Regions:
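C-terminal motif of bacterial Sec signal peptides marking the signal peptidase cleavage site
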Residues: 24-27
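Surface-exposed short loop/turn segments
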Residues: 107-108, 114-174, 249-282
Protein backbone atom coordinates (compact mmCIF):
# COMPACT_ATOMS: atom_id res chain seq x y z
CA UNK A 1 0.00 0.00 0.00
CA UNK A 2 2.84 2.31 0.90
CA UNK A 3 4.61 1.41 -2.35
CA UNK A 4 1.58 2.44 -4.41
CA UNK A 5 1.16 5.75 -2.60
CA UNK A 6 4.81 6.60 -3.25
CA UNK A 7 4.74 5.69 -6.92
CA UNK A 8 1.49 7.34 -7.98
CA UNK A 9 2.76 10.95 -7.93
CA UNK A 10 5.80 9.93 -9.94
CA UNK A 11 3.68 8.05 -12.49
CA UNK A 12 1.31 11.00 -12.74
CA UNK A 13 4.19 13.39 -13.42
CA UNK A 14 5.63 11.10 -16.08
CA UNK A 15 2.23 10.82 -17.74
CA UNK A 16 1.77 14.58 -17.78
CA UNK A 17 5.24 15.03 -19.25
CA UNK A 18 4.48 12.58 -22.08
CA UNK A 19 1.26 14.42 -22.90
CA UNK A 20 3.12 17.74 -22.87
CA UNK A 21 5.77 16.38 -25.21
CA UNK A 22 3.24 15.04 -27.70
CA UNK A 23 1.28 18.28 -27.69
CA UNK A 24 4.36 20.43 -28.18
CA UNK A 25 5.40 18.56 -31.31
CA UNK A 26 2.27 19.58 -33.19
CA UNK A 27 1.07 22.74 -31.46
CA UNK A 28 2.88 25.82 -32.67
CA UNK A 29 1.85 28.87 -34.65
CA UNK A 30 2.28 28.45 -38.40
CA UNK A 31 3.97 31.53 -39.87
CA UNK A 32 4.63 31.50 -43.63
CA UNK A 33 7.71 33.09 -45.15
CA UNK A 34 6.88 36.67 -46.11
CA UNK A 35 8.92 38.16 -48.93
CA UNK A 36 9.17 41.90 -48.58
CA UNK A 37 10.84 44.51 -50.77
CA UNK A 38 13.96 45.40 -48.77
CA UNK A 39 16.49 42.97 -50.26
CA UNK A 40 18.60 43.82 -53.27
CA UNK A 41 17.87 40.41 -54.75
CA UNK A 42 15.70 37.39 -54.02
CA UNK A 43 17.29 35.21 -56.70
CA UNK A 44 19.01 31.85 -56.18
CA UNK A 45 17.71 31.34 -52.65
CA UNK A 46 17.28 27.73 -51.52
CA UNK A 47 14.85 26.31 -48.99
CA UNK A 48 16.29 25.48 -45.58
CA UNK A 49 15.32 25.68 -41.92
CA UNK A 50 14.92 23.45 -38.91
CA UNK A 51 12.13 21.63 -37.11
CA UNK A 52 10.54 24.90 -35.96
CA UNK A 53 11.94 27.39 -38.47
CA UNK A 54 11.15 28.05 -42.12
CA UNK A 55 13.90 29.67 -44.18
CA UNK A 56 15.19 30.42 -47.66
CA UNK A 57 18.76 31.62 -48.04
CA UNK A 58 21.80 32.16 -50.16
CA UNK A 59 25.40 32.83 -49.12
CA UNK A 60 28.57 33.45 -51.12
CA UNK A 61 31.19 31.79 -48.88
CA UNK A 62 34.39 33.35 -50.26
CA UNK A 63 33.64 37.07 -49.71
CA UNK A 64 31.75 36.39 -46.48
CA UNK A 65 34.61 34.44 -44.93
CA UNK A 66 37.14 37.00 -46.19
CA UNK A 67 35.27 39.86 -44.52
CA UNK A 68 36.64 41.14 -41.22
CA UNK A 69 34.41 44.07 -40.34
CA UNK A 70 30.64 44.46 -40.31
CA UNK A 71 28.23 47.34 -39.81
CA UNK A 72 24.62 46.88 -38.70
CA UNK A 73 21.91 49.13 -40.08
CA UNK A 74 19.00 49.31 -37.67
CA UNK A 75 16.24 46.80 -38.37
CA UNK A 76 13.14 48.28 -39.97
CA UNK A 77 9.57 47.00 -40.22
CA UNK A 78 7.39 46.56 -43.31
CA UNK A 79 4.27 44.88 -41.97
CA UNK A 80 0.71 45.38 -43.12
CA UNK A 81 -0.74 45.42 -39.60
CA UNK A 82 1.79 47.79 -38.03
CA UNK A 83 -1.07 49.89 -36.65
CA UNK A 84 -2.04 46.97 -34.42
CA UNK A 85 1.13 47.37 -32.38
CA UNK A 86 2.32 50.09 -30.05
CA UNK A 87 5.35 51.76 -31.72
CA UNK A 88 7.36 51.32 -28.52
CA UNK A 89 6.67 47.58 -28.48
CA UNK A 90 7.52 47.27 -32.17
CA UNK A 91 10.78 49.11 -31.50
CA UNK A 92 11.63 46.57 -28.79
CA UNK A 93 11.29 43.75 -31.33
CA UNK A 94 13.44 45.39 -34.00
CA UNK A 95 16.06 46.42 -31.45
CA UNK A 96 16.17 42.91 -29.98
CA UNK A 97 16.98 41.65 -33.49
CA UNK A 98 19.81 44.19 -33.81
CA UNK A 99 21.16 43.28 -30.39
CA UNK A 100 21.15 39.56 -31.22
CA UNK A 101 22.82 40.21 -34.58
CA UNK A 102 25.51 42.34 -32.97
CA UNK A 103 26.26 39.75 -30.30
CA UNK A 104 26.32 36.87 -32.77
CA UNK A 105 28.45 38.64 -35.37
CA UNK A 106 30.95 39.66 -32.69
CA UNK A 107 32.09 36.03 -32.53
CA UNK A 108 34.13 36.51 -35.72
CA UNK A 109 33.73 40.04 -37.05
CA UNK A 110 34.73 43.41 -35.71
CA UNK A 111 31.47 45.34 -35.44
CA UNK A 112 31.96 49.00 -36.34
CA UNK A 113 29.85 52.08 -35.66
CA UNK A 114 27.16 53.34 -38.02
CA UNK A 115 29.44 56.03 -39.48
CA UNK A 116 32.33 53.68 -40.24
CA UNK A 117 33.08 51.72 -43.45
CA UNK A 118 32.86 47.93 -43.26
CA UNK A 119 33.45 44.87 -45.41
CA UNK A 120 29.82 43.85 -44.92
CA UNK A 121 26.73 45.91 -44.17
CA UNK A 122 23.86 43.98 -42.57
CA UNK A 123 20.25 45.09 -42.59
CA UNK A 124 17.16 43.17 -41.47
CA UNK A 125 13.49 43.95 -42.03
CA UNK A 126 10.53 42.57 -40.10
CA UNK A 127 8.01 41.49 -42.75
CA UNK A 128 5.28 40.08 -40.51
CA UNK A 129 4.29 39.78 -36.87
CA UNK A 130 1.54 37.42 -35.81
CA UNK A 131 0.18 39.07 -32.66
CA UNK A 132 0.08 37.21 -29.39
CA UNK A 133 -3.35 36.96 -27.80
CA UNK A 134 -2.85 38.70 -24.46
CA UNK A 135 -5.82 37.05 -22.74
CA UNK A 136 -4.64 33.56 -23.68
CA UNK A 137 -1.07 34.46 -22.72
CA UNK A 138 -2.21 35.72 -19.32
CA UNK A 139 -4.19 32.54 -18.69
CA UNK A 140 -1.21 30.40 -19.69
CA UNK A 141 1.17 32.37 -17.49
CA UNK A 142 -1.06 32.05 -14.42
CA UNK A 143 -1.66 28.35 -15.03
CA UNK A 144 2.03 27.68 -15.56
CA UNK A 145 3.06 29.40 -12.33
CA UNK A 146 0.72 27.24 -10.27
CA UNK A 147 0.86 23.82 -11.89
CA UNK A 148 4.52 23.65 -12.91
CA UNK A 149 5.55 23.95 -9.26
CA UNK A 150 3.08 21.29 -8.15
CA UNK A 151 3.90 18.77 -10.89
CA UNK A 152 7.59 19.63 -11.40
CA UNK A 153 7.20 19.38 -15.20
CA UNK A 154 6.86 22.09 -17.87
CA UNK A 155 3.26 22.99 -18.57
CA UNK A 156 2.33 23.85 -22.17
CA UNK A 157 0.65 27.07 -23.13
CA UNK A 158 -2.95 27.20 -24.21
CA UNK A 159 -2.87 26.50 -27.98
CA UNK A 160 -4.78 29.68 -28.78
CA UNK A 161 -3.41 33.00 -29.96
CA UNK A 162 0.21 31.93 -30.37
CA UNK A 163 2.25 34.62 -32.10
CA UNK A 164 5.06 34.54 -34.62
CA UNK A 165 7.70 36.48 -36.52
CA UNK A 166 8.88 36.75 -40.12
CA UNK A 167 12.10 38.56 -41.08
CA UNK A 168 14.28 39.06 -44.14
CA UNK A 169 17.88 40.25 -44.10
CA UNK A 170 20.95 40.61 -46.28
CA UNK A 171 24.66 41.35 -46.06
CA UNK A 172 26.05 43.68 -48.74
CA UNK A 173 29.74 43.97 -49.62
CA UNK A 174 31.90 47.02 -50.32
CA UNK A 175 31.05 46.75 -54.01
CA UNK A 176 27.36 47.14 -53.23
CA UNK A 177 26.38 43.60 -54.18
CA UNK A 178 24.58 41.10 -51.99
CA UNK A 179 26.84 38.49 -50.39
CA UNK A 180 24.24 36.69 -48.25
CA UNK A 181 20.49 36.83 -47.74
CA UNK A 182 17.80 35.06 -45.75
CA UNK A 183 14.03 34.87 -45.49
CA UNK A 184 13.08 33.52 -42.05
CA UNK A 185 9.89 32.76 -40.13
CA UNK A 186 9.00 30.99 -36.92
CA UNK A 187 5.93 30.60 -34.76
CA UNK A 188 5.66 30.33 -31.01
CA UNK A 189 5.66 26.81 -29.57
CA UNK A 190 3.41 25.63 -26.77
CA UNK A 191 6.27 24.27 -24.71
CA UNK A 192 9.42 26.23 -25.55
CA UNK A 193 8.08 29.78 -25.96
CA UNK A 194 7.10 31.34 -22.66
CA UNK A 195 3.83 33.27 -22.71
CA UNK A 196 4.24 37.04 -22.39
CA UNK A 197 1.23 39.29 -21.90
CA UNK A 198 1.88 41.51 -24.90
CA UNK A 199 0.78 41.55 -28.52
CA UNK A 200 4.47 41.36 -29.50
CA UNK A 201 5.37 38.92 -26.74
CA UNK A 202 6.13 35.96 -29.01
CA UNK A 203 7.71 38.07 -31.76
CA UNK A 204 10.05 39.55 -29.15
CA UNK A 205 10.97 36.12 -27.79
CA UNK A 206 11.67 34.80 -31.31
CA UNK A 207 13.76 37.79 -32.40
CA UNK A 208 16.90 36.43 -30.77
CA UNK A 209 16.48 33.15 -32.67
CA UNK A 210 16.53 35.00 -35.99
CA UNK A 211 19.55 37.03 -34.93
CA UNK A 212 21.38 33.86 -33.98
CA UNK A 213 20.55 32.08 -37.26
CA UNK A 214 21.52 34.96 -39.55
CA UNK A 215 24.72 35.82 -37.68
CA UNK A 216 25.73 32.14 -37.65
CA UNK A 217 25.34 32.05 -41.44
CA UNK A 218 27.83 34.90 -41.78
CA UNK A 219 30.21 33.59 -39.12
CA UNK A 220 30.37 30.14 -40.75
CA UNK A 221 29.86 31.26 -44.35
CA UNK A 222 27.30 28.52 -44.89
CA UNK A 223 23.76 27.34 -44.19
CA UNK A 224 23.33 27.79 -40.41
CA UNK A 225 20.79 24.98 -40.20
CA UNK A 226 23.29 22.35 -41.32
CA UNK A 227 26.17 20.88 -39.37
CA UNK A 228 26.75 20.79 -35.64
CA UNK A 229 25.58 23.42 -33.20
CA UNK A 230 28.06 26.01 -31.99
CA UNK A 231 28.91 26.22 -28.30
CA UNK A 232 28.14 29.76 -27.07
CA UNK A 233 31.28 31.86 -26.78
CA UNK A 234 32.29 33.60 -23.56
CA UNK A 235 31.40 37.02 -24.98
CA UNK A 236 27.98 35.78 -26.06
CA UNK A 237 27.22 34.35 -22.62
CA UNK A 238 28.36 37.57 -20.96
CA UNK A 239 26.18 39.70 -23.24
CA UNK A 240 23.13 37.46 -22.74
CA UNK A 241 23.43 37.93 -18.98
CA UNK A 242 23.31 41.70 -19.37
CA UNK A 243 27.05 42.33 -19.43
CA UNK A 244 28.87 44.74 -21.70
CA UNK A 245 29.30 43.80 -25.37
CA UNK A 246 32.59 42.90 -27.03
CA UNK A 247 32.49 45.98 -29.28
CA UNK A 248 31.37 49.50 -28.41
CA UNK A 249 29.20 49.65 -31.54
CA UNK A 250 26.87 47.11 -29.93
CA UNK A 251 26.18 49.47 -27.03
CA UNK A 252 23.83 51.37 -29.34
CA UNK A 253 21.34 48.52 -28.96
CA UNK A 254 21.35 48.52 -25.17
CA UNK A 255 22.09 45.68 -22.79
CA UNK A 256 20.17 42.42 -22.78
CA UNK A 257 17.72 42.11 -19.84
CA UNK A 258 19.76 39.20 -18.50
CA UNK A 259 18.54 37.43 -15.37
CA UNK A 260 15.90 40.09 -14.77
CA UNK A 261 14.52 39.42 -18.23
CA UNK A 262 14.51 35.68 -17.64
CA UNK A 263 12.49 36.12 -14.45
CA UNK A 264 10.11 38.52 -16.19
CA UNK A 265 9.64 35.97 -18.96
CA UNK A 266 8.80 33.23 -16.48
CA UNK A 267 6.18 35.51 -14.92
CA UNK A 268 4.69 36.35 -18.32
CA UNK A 269 5.47 40.07 -18.05
CA UNK A 270 5.60 42.20 -21.23
CA UNK A 271 9.07 42.75 -22.77
CA UNK A 272 9.08 46.41 -21.76
CA UNK A 273 9.16 45.50 -18.07
CA UNK A 274 12.77 44.38 -18.30
CA UNK A 275 14.11 45.50 -21.70
CA UNK A 276 15.03 49.19 -21.82
CA UNK A 277 15.50 49.10 -25.58
CA UNK A 278 18.09 50.95 -27.63
CA UNK A 279 20.64 53.07 -25.82
CA UNK A 280 20.97 55.64 -28.60
CA UNK A 281 19.26 56.62 -31.83
CA UNK A 282 20.84 56.56 -35.22
Amino acid sequence: MTFISLRLPEMRSQGVFCVVLLLSLSSCASVPLHQGTSLGSYADMTASGGSLTKAKLRVDPAPVLAAQTVRIVRTSAQIGNSGAFDPKNLALVTNAIDRALCTGLSDRFQVVASNQPADLVVHATVTDIVPTNRTAAATSAVASLGTSVALAVPIPRIPIGLGGLSVEAEAVGLDGTQKAAMLWSRGANMLTTKARISTVGDAYSLSSAFGADFSRMLVKGQDPFKGTSMIPSAQKIKASLGGGPKYDACKAFGSAPGITGAVAGQLGLPPGWSDKGAATTQ
